[in-house]
Amino acid sequence: MPVIYASILAKYYGRQRINSDVQTINNIISDAVSVEPKAYRDAMSHYAGAVQIVTTDGPAGRRGLTLTAACSVSDAPATVLICLQKIHEDNRLFIENGVFAINTLAGTHQQLADAFSGRIGLTQNERFELATWERLATGAPVLADALAAFDCRVVSIQDHSTHHVLFGEVIALRSNPDASALIYLNRRYHTLDL
């Protein structure tokens, strides 16, 4: 049970009762059957997500990849999170560099999204050569014509199951509100006019 939730319950019900309730909840949850990974992925394919290219650069090296697993956490301080698969060893570069940029793709960026997803089989250098990149504050590559770009320093890392979850404080940002958005839904790209 999250610590914050437990502390709220303790405030209202008292510590002793909370410990008993938490144990009861944990017993119920431990008896529950987990969903099958394929069924979960199939259901999540109906969850529309903004398409992002996340990038990093620094002493450990440069890397970029396409993902939809990014979201806002807080606006004070401005914080986002990204989820990176552990199976790809090179994703450790994001952790080792301690910085990343989230580049929200416009509707015109489908080929770039494919390139950074690895579908085309390009090297990292070849992927970066396909677009114009700039730097804001951290040194992570920022796509010049991104719909929005969030330049972040890593403030927390949580490993969970198959993924590293990186929390980043937004140090700088830029937006281009006149562009359309690229979204991913039903395992396909779609353009959303703004």
Pin down the residues of each PLM region.
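Basic, polyanion-binding surface patches
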Residues: 2-194
